[in-house]
């Protein structure tokens, strides 16, 4: 699972879901990529699930890059707890994703198989996304 090794503060404010991505909007390493079309918090489990879906489809011969990292903790209070008495304990680690951000990149010789693998990964994510290539970036 992807979680930070050490953080300065255990609990943080929730990141805002507004604006567009300022960096990481182009395919830099691979030939194909998954680009976010909306805002979302993507958890470490969802990132891992998408990575496994890609790797199982391409088997061998390709390389996958994960361009996001879940660096923000989201907290939750226990069920049936009264209001007050402080902030809840950290439950998940999330990556704050903005529109235009490239989430995954893939280098694979066969375009059709690469697109199928990335489509399977998109289905694992809680966000609308599209597949882009190195040539068709905006």
From Swiss-Prot:
The keyword ATP-binding appears for this protein: no
What domain of life? Bacteria
Q: Which GO terms describe its cellular component?
A: cytosolic large ribosomal subunit
Q: Name one Pfam family in it.
A: Ribosomal_L16
Query: What biological process terms from GO does the record include?
Result: translation
Alphabetized CDD domains for the sequence: Ribosomal_L16_L10e
* Subunit comment: Part of the 50S ribosomal subunit.
Q: What is this protein called?
A: Large ribosomal subunit protein uL16
Q: Which organism is it from?
A: Mycobacteroides abscessus (strain ATCC 19977 / DSM 44196 / CCUG 20993 / CIP 104536 / JCM 13569 / NCTC 13031 / TMC 1543 / L948) (Mycobacterium abscessus)
